[in-house]
Amino acid sequence: MVERELKVRPIRSGTVIDHIQAGQALNVLKILGISGTTGATVSVLMNVSSRKLGKKDIVKVEDRELREDEVNKIALIAPGATINIVRDYAVVEKYAVDLPDVIVGVVRCQNPSCISNTNEPIKPKMLVKGKNPVVLRCFYCDQPLTERIAEYLL
């Protein structure tokens, strides 16, 4: 018989974000606007053993279901993540994050001369060229963005 160790108690209702690349949990919290002062009950597990990934992070947010735009942002930094919606201690919905082909107003271009970074009333627009690993390309100046994506989130 396999013995399982429970590291964090189950949540009654809310969202569990699983299969986050190790070391990205704090960026997920930033995307969700969760800090120590928000009052939300949050469990963060970092560098947990995983058969699939070797190591992974997990974030549990009680009494909150994520919006589509939040899930899309999470997909940028954790393209292999799984979202679990929990109600009355049971997973009622489970799905993998997925990036749309075009992202508007979520990630700024890293090119300081890009028209989307000037005083023009233009929202940044990124084309998704790869999903895992994430590869973005600016629609306006063709500048690629492949690393440190969390630093460019709006």
Curated annotation (Swiss-Prot):
The UniProt entry, under InterPro entries, shows:
Asp_carbamoyltransf_reg_N, Asp_carbamoylTrfase_reg, Asp_carbamoyltrfase_reg_C, Asp_carbatrfase_reg_C_sf, Asp_carbatrfase_reg_N_sf
Disulphides:
none
Work out whether the entry's keyword set contains Zinc: yes
Q: How is the cofactor bound?
A: Binds 1 zinc ion per subunit.
Cofactor(s) it depends on: Zn(2+)
Q: Which residues bind Zn(2+)?
A: 109, 114, 138, 141
Listed under GO biological process in this entry are: 'de novo' pyrimidine nucleobase biosynthetic process; pyrimidine nucleotide biosynthetic process
GO terms (molecular function) for this protein are: metal ion binding
Keyword list, A-Z: Metal-binding, Pyrimidine biosynthesis, Zinc
Superkingdom assignment:
Archaea
Give me the Gene Ontology terms describing cellular component: aspartate carbamoyltransferase complex
* Annotated function: Involved in allosteric regulation of aspartate carbamoyltransferase.
HAMAP family, from UniProt?
A: Asp_carb_tr_reg (MF_00002)
Q: How does it assemble?
A: Contains catalytic and regulatory chains.
Family designation: Belongs to the PyrI family.
Protein name, as recorded = Aspartate carbamoyltransferase regulatory chain
Q: Which organism is it from?
A: Methanothrix thermoacetophila (strain DSM 6194 / JCM 14653 / NBRC 101360 / PT)
